[in-house]
Amino acid sequence: MRKSGRGLALVLASVMTMASLAGCGVNVSSKDDTAAATAQTTTAAGETVATKEGEKVTLKVVDWSDSTKERREAFHKKFMEENPDVTIEYTVLTSDQFKETVISAIKAGNAPDLFPIPSGMKLSSVVDENWFMPMNEYVGEDFLNSFGAGALNEGITTLDGKVYVLPEAANIINTLIFYNKTVLNEAGIDENSLPKTWSEFREVCKQVTEAGGGKFYGMIDSGAQANRLELELRSLASTAGGKCSDISQIIMVDGENTLNSEAMVKAFDFFDTLVKDGSMHPDSVTLKAPEARALFAQNQAAFLVQGAWCISTWRKDNPDLDFGVMAMPVPDDGAKGKLPYVGAQPWMGISANCAHPDVAAKYLKALYSEDYQAGLVEDGGFVSVIDSVNQTAMTDDVMLEYYKLNQEAAALAPDPIVAKPETALVYGEVSAISPSMGEIVQGVLAQSVDYKAELATLAENTQKEWMRAIDAVKASGVDVSAEDFEFKNWDAMKNYTADMYESR
């Protein structure tokens, strides 16, 4: 079954009301909005806007960064003290609320001054619809040069050399394994002998579960979130040589997707044994990531697969939790690939209709200052796109180990959009296939599906949909082909570096 995602923004624009926008905390109108909604940010080619000294400015900022909300609010207070003519109206939405409300606000001509690209949308598409303005002339080259290698990429944050959006953080893997030292000790597992292979991991999980007697289990998972489960299985398959890449990527090997590869089936076999062994916390099938994280902190499981964001949450909410982080186990015959991740992803940009882009740029420069970024890194669970900050501010012992493991156990995967920005149009054309891989994993957790048959069907339907989308974009006059999504020089044990795109 194919779920159509095309035309979502237009549908939302027609069905969402302005009352619903206000109800979610987004003020889509104010006394200054009539002028601002139609303001032109450039009066002529190459000419920028300069806000008059003493002019009162309200910046509307909307995003979904709830994990940094406390830091952000303190930042806003300081920013307004240092810039008394500026008032910041900041709204934090869930990612679902963001999709449902901000897209509608944009279509209605009431976009916030600063906002991120909605999840699943590509830069080329939103720039074509005039959502963002290029910021180079407002922020300056010195500011842009402060970003680390791989943070600003053509087709991702930048088009034709013009930067439209900035990444929130450096992109690191989010499928390392946290281990609960208290649970392992109670089960008689030596922390210095953590499992490194699939068989070892399975045996340790069985030992922990037996020792727990219903009090704790080998592993707990976020079964209510299909995306988390898919990331987990993709990572397992990657260690077996699957070349799965990130969940958002269209990657082909020998002209085919890898969703039913031998490595993927092996990964599902391994996961299935953990469930059949009874090593999974019985509530896993219904838990969202925050709930699984909380039960792990209550010493109900030895292992949890999640990302670095857990660290600061546990430090704040569960200061007595004794935990560490380890690499994902690999097949018994050794790793044939590392955990794939892609470069920093697009986030915040300045609205094309922003009446005071120079003030918005000043906000961004302060947001990415070493002072503010250092605080986020010090909290743990955050890796800044400003390299110099990470070198001095990363002090949490578990976060340091996480960062080290990211360097050792992960490898940068190729990105078709970096290789050829026109491929973004294919992503916009593709519709989701159901059941997805994550939904199939949910079935494994519930022991309710024949995952081998489902994977075969998923791979077949995905291949048909990818080829249909490529043909549709090609028919519109854009030079794209299946070869644009294949990287024959990709060694999954190594980083795919910028120079490799030229020789693929």
Model-assigned labels for residue ranges:
Residues M1-L59, E81, R468-R504:
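Short, low-complexity disordered leader/linker segments with a strong preference
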Residues A44-T51, G120-L176, L231-E232, T239, ...:
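Hinge/lid segment of periplasmic solute-binding proteins
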Residues E55-D66, V86-T91, D113-L114, Y164, ...:
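Short, well-ordered beta-strand elements
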Residues K78-E154, N185-G188, S193-K196, L295, ...:
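Extracytoplasmic "Venus flytrap"/periplasmic binding protein-like
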Residues P319, M326, E378-L445, D479-R504:
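Long, aromatic- and glycine/proline-rich binding clefts that accommodate carbohydrate-like moieties
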